[in-house]
């Protein structure tokens, strides 16, 4: 018989030493847990919108003592302008930024969103007039629809400047805004950009367009508030928000993501914003800009220079102790010292101010894959200019709220820049002309590729000339304009045609031809 052998007891593993956390780390963990638990209350989509009250005159109350106003401005032909004109626009932009002190917050918002498809198509359709040319009108409308699909006219791009101040009450805020807004409008006038102050309903309609990127119709009247018991947030809020994920969120049926621009380039290019906005999807770009007090900015730069000099001295002492030449210092220290001295010189002698800027980008898409592709495209544009587009982690709601054109900034990722460095983000590209009504088709914009529809009777100078080299299409352009006027308006068309070039066109349109020559039977009575 064999005695059963007892299994040998396994050696116990030594318990792992507990990781000791600092007080700051414990507080951070507690804060994250509190945020994850929430406050136990049921929240609605309206709670995300960061303002308390909107007044009919366009004054917005953000909290107890913070108020904002919004200005909409149109585009100018910056990319096609001469270098001297571009410099003038850049300098005017610098003057506008310098005119606002540290008590005024500025938010530059560039919005690219889809217009209501039905409204858009109606603007290019030619109404039937009950004659036997209606089939030509239908063919002409089909041609316009094809041209519409070639460009980005499904997207409308709008630009806004939101100004924010601190004030005790609405009366004080209105009194101060009257001067601030007037100065901003004058600066835009110098740049050649048409600008206007938004009323309360116009501001709400703009926010509704951002929160409903597919172009849903906006329906609201101030008289509806009291009987319905609703707030203005109820009329503009989307059906839902979902901020459960770390790096993206959903707004109704849209997939969205908020990123910030990490500026690491030594020099910036004025085409960056233009390329960033050149997309076929919804996009919201916001730049929060706030100037620093000039004396405080100079003191801050001087302190940085002192710190760098102290680091240089320590590096030189270490080099001497180790037997090296004391003039050999780390390259980064020499670079930082030179840049800091250049900034100090700009602040003291070149009429420059120091600004803190937060650059946010919000992408909207119909699917998760489309959103990721749009983010890659935007990141490649940033990489082209030696910058990085970084997704916000666990700050998507705060980032989206900060990107809305309301003047609220909850993202404290800021970059200090001088006036010239801020103004290089020029918000202008090319002026678009897309009138409705009796507007005529004049081709595609060479810069943006969008359709040009212009009603010259609405312009300051309705007269026009067609200029071009031989064979460039001057006659074709004139004939296209004649056909457009004939099909779309009830205007009279008079053609002086010494070479009888337009005779077949006039005959096809059943016009009247008057022949005047020494041998003709028709005459002009000079009396």
PLM region spans:
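N-terminal pre-Walker A segment at the start of P-loop NTPase domains
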Residues: 428-453
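Extended, folded cores of ATP/NTP-driven motor/assembly subunits in large transport
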Residues: 1-430
